[in-house]
């Protein structure tokens, strides 16, 4: 299996104007790069504080550190949010969203979405459509799956400036600031699959064979045939066509699978 890693400096949504604070963050970055710079899976460094307002000189010094600690050809690139100070003008890769590559003031660098499929995470956003507990049943799980499918599809409808993204988060988990768990995973906290898992599995080629991965031809019927189920039957598959039958084959439907945008 292929694996790439974005190594991020510790810190989130907090800045202190005391110069010592910035110095300690930069020291964290140096130690982080020294720890991981010989790992071939490292694709990017994220040397700034996540979702934090920081001054321009801090951002430029952080970028300089990534070059000082790995001053060789083919070094991992430095990435940060496109709207943060100094990033759009100086960094190697910027964090953005599908559509940023088509704006008049688009960045010159490649764009990567590091948390796709997620809406703004405030107190009310816990109710958004990409979050569903397995205990809620068929309809909420289908809404979540289709929401993530839409986010995934949007990344394919971009220019070559946009290079991909990573989903947040694979697993349901507890959080410190909300009484309810985060329900946005494609697995629950016990690693049980949701419908959304099948969405992403259906994006792998049917011809793929790998000893460590669930692969090959697949089909998943996202329908429980209960009294609460929708009239439409949603199927996730990587095959060319699907044949559904009910009542011992007395009714059968065969439908082609249309793969838009190559996925």
What residues fall within each predicted segment?
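Substrate-binding/catalytic cleft of secreted carbohydrate-active enzymes
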Residues: 1-196, 216-219, 257
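Catalytic cores of secreted or luminal carbohydrate-active enzymes
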Residues: 166-263
């Amino acid at each position: 299996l292929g694996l790439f890693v974005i190594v991020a400096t510790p810190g989130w949504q907090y800045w202190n104007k005391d110069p010592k604070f910035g110095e300690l963050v930069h020291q964290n970055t140096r130690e982080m790069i020294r720890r991981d710079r010989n790992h071939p899976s490292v694709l990017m460094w994220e040397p700034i504080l996540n979702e934090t307002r920081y001054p321009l000189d801090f951002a430029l010094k952080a970028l300089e550190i990534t070059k000082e600690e790995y001053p060789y050809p083919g070094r991992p690139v430095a990435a940060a949010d496109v709207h943060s100070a100094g990033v759009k003008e100086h960094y190697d890769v910027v964090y953005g969203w599908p559509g940023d590559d088509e704006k008049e003031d688009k960045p010159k660098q490649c764009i990567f979405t590091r948390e796709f499929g997620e809406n703004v995470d405030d107190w009310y956003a816990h109710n958004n459509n990409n979050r569903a507990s397995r205990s809620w049943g068929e309809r909420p799980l289908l809404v979540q799956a289709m929401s993530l499918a839409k986010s995934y599809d949007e990344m394919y409808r971009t220019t070559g400036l946009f290079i991909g993204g990573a989903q947040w988060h694979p697993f349901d988990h507890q959080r410190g600031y909300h009484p309810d768990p985060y329900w946005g995973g494609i697995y629950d906290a016990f690693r049980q699959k949701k419908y959304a898992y099948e969405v992403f599995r259906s994006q792998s080629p049917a011809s793929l064979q790998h000893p460590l991965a669930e692969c090959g031809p697949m089909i998943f019927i996202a329908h429980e045939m209960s009294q609460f189920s929708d009239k439409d039957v949603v199927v996730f598959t990587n095959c060319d066509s699907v044949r559904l039958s009910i009542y011992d084959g007395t009714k059968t439907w065969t439908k082609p699978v249309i793969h838009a945008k190559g996925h």
